[in-house]
């Protein structure tokens, strides 16, 4: 995370991803935080992005769905320094056909020091962090 930009007033670029069994959880979290999310640039994998747009009227850049390379597209944006926060509600109990892509995405967030939330509690901590608010202040 580039802490030198804190307080710059720049909106953050937030990636939102959810496996099928976790989409309802992500939508509930996003609805609770919709006012905050509206002030930032959002990118999401296919179906997740469509749901966020259709149900919450959020402006969302959509990449491919996860199994079709969307996780890798978000990972590439992380490598390019284009993602500031990843909220990824993944299902640890359900094997995914694209598990290697999921692992690669989570690995690159660690390598690039991108704050990552894999559940609601962590997402709540990150989005309510004073550091998050400082960076997002207008």
Question: For the regions a protein language model found, what residue spans apply to each?
Answer:
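Short internal beta-strands
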Residues: 39-48, 52
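General beta-strand structural signal in soluble alpha/beta enzymes
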Residues: 43-45, 62-64, 88, 116-120
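Glycine-rich, flexible N-terminal cofactor/catalytic loop recognition
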Residues: 24-42
């Amino acid at each position: 995370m580039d802490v030198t930009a804190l307080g710059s007033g720049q909106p953050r670029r937030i990636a939102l991803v959810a496996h099928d069994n976790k989409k309802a959880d992500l939508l509930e979290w996003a609805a609770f935080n919709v006012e905050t999310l509206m002030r930032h640039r959002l990118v999401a994998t296919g179906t997740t992005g469509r749901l966020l747009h259709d149900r919450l009227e959020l402006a969302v850049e959509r990449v491919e769905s996860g199994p079709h390379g969307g996780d890798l597209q978000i990972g590439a944006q992380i490598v390019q320094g284009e993602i500031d926060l990843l909220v990824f509600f993944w299902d640890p109990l359900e094997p995914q056909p694209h598990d290697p892509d999921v692992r690669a995405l989570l690995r690159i967030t660690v390598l690039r020091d991108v704050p990552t939330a894999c559940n609601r509690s962590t997402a709540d901590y990150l989005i309510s962090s004073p550091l998050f608010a400082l960076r997002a202040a207008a």
